[in-house]
């Protein structure tokens, strides 16, 4: 595990962070995904060569709205999904297509190169070709080519490991240089310092491990702010298989005195149930638009930190 080796950084503060889940359902049948991967050669296979089942893909994406200390709002997208048809539906359902057209979304932050977070890029760029895109600097040539062939005409920012990257007051990104299944390298996540509350982190899949991520935030952001909340995939039990070795993750989260846990996507419903049993403050949802349970923040749901 290679994480940023950094000195404490002042990332500033913001008033609040609102996250609207556009889609956390990256696929609709987990067994089919596993079968696709197995047929292609296993978890070390290049994702770009897997013959994915055409009707099983969805995507992961969220709209993030940050209120600055002066009351102004900044909007950006966290990830851009997978299946273009599914993402088109999600964007139109939530009005993201209009926000992109009107220039009200500032940038796209792609957590990592996995297909369900990145391959829906053509839909996003259809509405805003000049949108600024932030990625890690560990993308393979296929990922770079996808950006080009998707019609991107804006600025591409590549963030590397070794330091926290201040994006705007109250918000910073941290990149972990780690190998990930399906031949992906590197993932980064976001930290927000919310005035009067503490640190909030937003993740894609959190392949770096949620405790590693939260440790980095607590130790490397000036002022020793406490952890307040988190949103996103935590990759604890993505295919609903629980093992005893995962128990310390739940205990570790419980020890942090978090105030809001809005985990979804690859966290796993079984992990959500373990969190609830451990009295973690899990934010629940409405189980609509394809999300499978009301026990977590799902498609079309919002959470405010």
Placement of each model-derived feature along the sequence:
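Short active-site oxyanion
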Residues: 73-76, 106-107, 130-132, 199-200, ...
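Divalent metal-coordination and catalytic microenvironments
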Residues: 64, 79, 91, 112, ...
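Metallo-beta-lactamase
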Residues: 135-188, 284-304
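A short acidic, amphipathic alpha-helical/loop segment
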Residues: 90, 120-124, 146, 213-216, ...
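Conserved beta-strand hairpin/beta-sheet module of binuclear metal-dependent hydrolase folds
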Residues: 25-29, 34-94, 187-203
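Active-site metal-binding motif and surrounding structural segment of the metallo-beta-lactamase
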Residues: 85-134, 221-231
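Short polar catalytic/cofactor-binding loops
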Residues: 15-17, 21-29
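Cap/insert and terminal regions of metallo-dependent hydrolase folds
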Residues: 113-115, 191, 196-201, 205-296
């Amino acid at each position: 595990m290679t994480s940023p080796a950094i000195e404490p950084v002042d990332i500033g503060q913001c008033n609040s962070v609102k996250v609207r889940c556009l889609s956390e359902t990256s696929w609709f049948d987990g067994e089919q995904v596993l079968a696709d991967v197995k047929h292609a050669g296993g978890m070390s296979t290049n994702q770009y060569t897997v013959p994915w089942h055409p009707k099983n893909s969805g995507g992961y994406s969220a709209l993030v709205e940050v209120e600055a200390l002066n009351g102004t709002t900044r909007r950006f997208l966290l990830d851009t999904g997978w299946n273009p048809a599914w993402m088109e539906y999600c964007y139109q359902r939530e009005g993201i297509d209009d926000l992109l057209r009107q220039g009200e979304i500032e940038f796209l932050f792609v957590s990592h190169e996995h297909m369900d977070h990145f391959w829906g890029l053509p839909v996003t760029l259809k509405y805003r070709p000049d949108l600024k895109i932030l990625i890690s600097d560990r993308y393979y040539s296929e990922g770079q080519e996808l950006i080009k062939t998707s019609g991107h005409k804006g600025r591409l920012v590549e963030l590397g490991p070794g330091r926290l990257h201040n994006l705007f007051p109250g918000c910073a990104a941290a990149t972990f240089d780690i190998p990930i299944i399906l031949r992906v390298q590197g993932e980064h996540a976001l930290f927000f310092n919310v005035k009067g509350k503490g640190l909030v982190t937003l993740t894609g899949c959190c392949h770096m491990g949620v405790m590693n991520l939260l440790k980095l935030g607590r130790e490397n952001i000036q002022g020793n702010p406490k952890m307040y909340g988190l949103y996103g995939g935590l990759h604890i039990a993505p295919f609903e298989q629980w093992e005893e070795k995962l128990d310390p993750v739940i205990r570790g989260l419980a020890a942090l005195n978090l105030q809001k846990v809005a985990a979804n996507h690859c966290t796993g419903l079984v992990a959500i149930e373990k969190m609830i049993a451990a009295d973690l403050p899990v934010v629940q949802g409405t189980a609509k638009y394809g999300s499978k349970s009301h026990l977590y923040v799902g498609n079309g749901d919002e959470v405010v930190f």
